[in-house]
Regions:
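Pan-zinc metallopeptidase signature
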Residues: 24-56, 60, 212-282
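Auxiliary, metal-adjacent structural segments of Zn-dependent hydrolase domains
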Residues: 60-150
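Active-site alpha-helix of zinc metalloproteases
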Residues: 147-159, 163-164, 220, 224
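Post-HEXXH active-site segment of zinc metalloproteases
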Residues: 151, 155, 166-204, 243-248
């Protein structure tokens, strides 16, 4: 059954069409963490990543998982099977091995401190929804899941995967993306997909036109823009998304062009779709 997901970021209604998922609003850009194996103790995600890496349960050759509190067996599909099955093969090929860790709550006790898994829900400023620990060829992705809607979890899962991809994108993908963004900047297109890239774009737009299309500020913006757009793209393949227009949104024709580019670079797996017209008529 296809459910509707309403996203209150900067995109356009009804652009993405896919398979399965709940109804929800996209959460703010801010991480939240999950829980410890032992209620009486706090463990940092770094400590848990070291401890858990040998005891993960395999989903696919590239993906494994572990729950730090009881998860009903009937929930495994929406937390694990469906989102992993929706990933394009070309995306999977670029990723390290990934361990998905479902925690009750994640907390950052101090502004620059380590993220910890805790049993009780932290105060809102300390709550983290997702974080990652990357060592060698294993990335451990931690998520706050207790009391969170599955659609929120999906957003953060795909955002963490997009972040990994943005650190490993091949030259061909990078050049393609840079070309798209330079065209947008030449046309003085305003708006973005999400808050991170929007803020970096504002800084870039304050520079002289000749200085906008290269250099570190441009590359930083391009990486975040790629991450935000890939998050939306992957989420849309997994789930049926209605995107709610916002005042900072990227104009729909430019967003569509980005998604078409990602579709050509990272085609969806069989029986998963990007645009409404991709869905076979019954």
């Amino acid at each position: 059954m296809v459910a509707k997901l309403q996203i209150s970021v900067f995109c356009v209604w009804g652009l993405l069409q896919s398979n399965r998922s709940p109804t929800l609003k996209m959460p703010p850009v801010k991480g939240r963490p999950r829980t410890t194996p032992r209620a009486a103790t706090r463990s940092t995600t770094d400590e848990l990543a070291r401890r858990l890496k040998g005891g993960l349960t395999v989903i696919t050759p590239r993906f494994s998982w572990h729950a730090l509190y009881p998860i009903a067996e009937e929930d495994h599909r929406q937390y694990l099977t469906d989102p992993v099955a929706a990933l394009p093969p070309a995306v999977i090929d670029l990723l390290p091995r990934i361990g998905i860790v479902l925690a009750p709550y994640l907390e950052r006790p101090a502004a620059k401190g380590a993220v910890e898994v805790v049993e009780k829900k932290p105060a809102e400023p300390k709550l983290v929804l997702s974080t990652r620990v990357v060592n060698d060829e294993l990335a451990m992705l931690f998520f706050t899941t207790r009391g969170e809607q599955v659609a929120d979890y999906h957003y953060f899962l795909f955002d963490e995967i997009a972040a990994l991809l943005s650190q490993r994108w091949p030259d061909e993908v990078q050049e393609n993306w840079h070309r798209l963004l330079r065209e947008e900047l030449s046309a003085e297109v305003h708006g973005e997909v999400d808050d991170r890239s929007w803020r970096l774009k504002q800084g870039l737009l304050r520079r002289p036109m000749a200085a906008r299309k290269d250099g570190k500020p441009f590359r930083d913006y391009a990486r975040e823009s790629f991450r935000d757009t890939v998050t939306l793209y992957l989420h849309g393949i997994c789930c049926d998304i209605d995107v709610e227009a916002g005042p900072r949104q990227l104009p729909s024709r430019y967003l569509r062009k980005r998604l078409e580019s990602l579709k050509s670079l990272f085609p969806p797996p069989p029986e998963h779709y990007v645009f409404p017209e991709d869905v076979p008529r019954s």
